[in-house]
A protein has these predicted regions:
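Extracytoplasmic
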Residues: 1-2, 41-42, 66, 95, ...
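Pre-active-site segment of Zn-dependent metallo-hydrolases
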Residues: 4-47, 58-62, 127-157
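Active-site-proximal loop/helix segments of hydrolase catalytic cores
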Residues: 106-184
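Beta-strand-turn-beta hairpins that frame and shape the catalytic cleft
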Residues: 8-14, 91-100, 113-121, 229-231, ...
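Active-site neighborhood of phospho(di)ester-bond hydrolases with catalytic His/Asp-centered motifs
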Residues: 15-17, 42-54, 71-75, 122-125, ...
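Active-site environment of divalent metal-dependent phosphoester hydrolases
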Residues: 3, 22-23, 51-56, 78-81, ...
Length: 258
């Protein structure tokens, strides 16, 4: 939901930027992470990119009552929050299944590249080209682009299987400049747009027109939408989409390793 995603492999669960929504637009109860959900996993890793309301819900700190939870958060966040703290460029081995590397953001906090059972997952947090082109001065636009491109250079050459990246229509004209540049530089095998503020129709159109032979793009627009990834012996990846609003669909889209 919004920028919140969970990724499971075996008995390991990753949770990124969990948020239950604003009052009046709360995440449906059936789509929330519950004690029952957590009970299925022997290790849970909760990644918090920064402290903005829409990326950090304090409810995550109640989960450790129900499962072995490790929290990963920026070293700049409130000192009262416990967990493994990271700075830009830091790397931590969290378990024999999971390790993480922290990258910078163009807003607060961090973005994370997590490897779980050989699958490399990037969550951008609020990393984007926040140019606000229709409101900003030419100098502000240039600075926003430069700051974003500098972070992208630190990611050049990183292998990414799945990327969660902001595609925010509020930016107005050229709202897709950031994700397009990210896809060009990093070439993730699968990109999932996020942070689109209920503008599902924009994201569906973006996914339709922006996918490429290098990067498949799938719009997960409804809380509870799921994707199943399968890998063969040659590391080709097959993507199966299941939406809560329709019957399961096997896209059988094979994305070959780079």
């Amino acid at each position: 939901y919004h920028s919140g995603f969970s990724v499971a492999s075996g008995e390991t669960l990753l949770v990124f930027d969990y948020w239950m929504g604003r009052q009046g637009k709360k995440l449906p109860a059936a789509q929330r992470i519950t004690p029952e959900t957590l009970s299925h996993f022997s290790e849970v890793f909760v990644f918090i990119s920064h402290g903005h309301e829409d990326h950090f819900d304090p409810v995550v700190y109640t989960w450790e009552q129900y499962a072995p939870v490790t929290y990963i958060l920026p070293e700049t966040m409130d000192a009262s929050l416990h967990g493994r703290r990271m700075g830009v460029g830091g790397e931590i081995t969290l378990s024999r299944h999971v390790k993480v590397k922290a990258f910078d953001s163009t807003d607060e906090g961090l973005s994370y590249l997590v490897e779980m059972d050989g699958i490399r997952i990037f969550h951008a947090g609020d990393l984007n080209n926040w140019h606000w082109r229709e409101e900003s001065t030419p100098r502000e636009i240039e600075e926003a682009e430069r700051d974003f491109q500098q972070v992208m250079e630190t990611m050049r050459g990183e292998k990414v299987d799945v990327a969660f990246f902001p595609v925010d229509p509020r930016l107005g004209m050229m709202f897709d400049a950031g994700p397009n540049y990210f896809a060009m530089v990093v070439k993730p095998r699968l990109m999932i747009p996020m942070h689109f503020w209920e503008r599902a129709e924009v994201i569906r159109e973006y996914a339709r027109r922006s996918r490429s032979p290098q990067t498949e793009i799938i719009a997960m627009t409804t809380p509870g939408d799921m994707i199943l990834l399968e890998f063969d012996e040659q590391e080709n990846m097959t993507v199966h989409m299941q939406s809560v609003t329709s019957a399961p669909v096997a896209r059988n889209k094979k994305v070959q390793d780079r």
